[in-house]
Regions:
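Glycosyltransferase donor-sugar binding loop
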Residues: 1-4, 29-42, 57
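A conserved mid-protein helix/loop that constitutes part of the nucleotide-sugar donor-binding site
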Residues: 5-20, 40, 125
Length: 193
């Protein structure tokens, strides 16, 4: 998701891991989403591995949501340049099991591996190992996806907005009981007097 031809996106790390992965998971398919020129990556790849990689191009928000809900795992092999990792939050929210490099932003978001599997950044062998383990263990993959999806709800804007609103409301109104329904809010009762 994003310009895959930018080195910091780490697509080369994933491509370098593919020969190892395909030895253990011969049916593996890699879908690459985002704008960029796929020929740049395909030219140096073993022809037998090329048919395992499909470049989808840039996805609309709707297509991105469908994508996240349909994959066995979302791989983020980024090598740096991320301050939060919104794409990981989107993948988690979509119910995908996440495998990501251990760059600080991803490690923090995934809480050191609690909500997604981490691999050593720029280490294609470690990436291959983590992907193979995760895809071979459907129970772990499903559990990781479920826990990640639950965790991602805290990043939903309606929930974040509601929590911010409650903080302001408590600061303004004081000790009044805070509810989730607008009609029960202390400020609303005062406003409607």
């Amino acid at each position: 998701m994003g310009r895959f031809n930018e080195p910091r996106k780490g697509l080369k790390v994933l491509i370098d891991a593919l020969p190892i992965i395909s030895r253990f998971l011969p049916e593996i398919k890699v879908l690459v989403a985002g704008p960029g020129d796929p020929d740049e990556f395909l030219k140096d790849i073993d022809p037998q591995l090329r048919n395992r990689i499909k470049f989808l191009g840039k996805l609309t928000e709707s297509e991105k949501a469908d994508f996240m809900t349909s994959v066995n795992a979302f791989i983020a092999p980024n090598t740096g340049g991320e301050s939060f990792g919104i794409i990981l939050a989107e993948a988690l929210a979509g119910g995908a099991a996440v495998v990501a490099s251990d760059i600080p932003a991803f490690e923090a978001l995934l809480q050191k591996g609690k909500y997604g599997r981490l691999f050593k950044s720029e280490d294609s062998t470690d990436l291959a190992k983590v992907i193979i383990e995760l895809l071979r263990d459907s129970q772990e993959r499903d559990s990781l996806a479920k826990n990640g999806q639950s965790f991602a709800q805290r990043f939903d804007w309606s929930r974040v907005g509601e929590e911010i609103f409650e903080v302001y409301e408590m600061a303004i109104v004081g000790k009044g009981k805070v509810g989730l329904v607008s009609d029960n809010r202390p400020w609303n009762r005062i406003w409607n007097r």
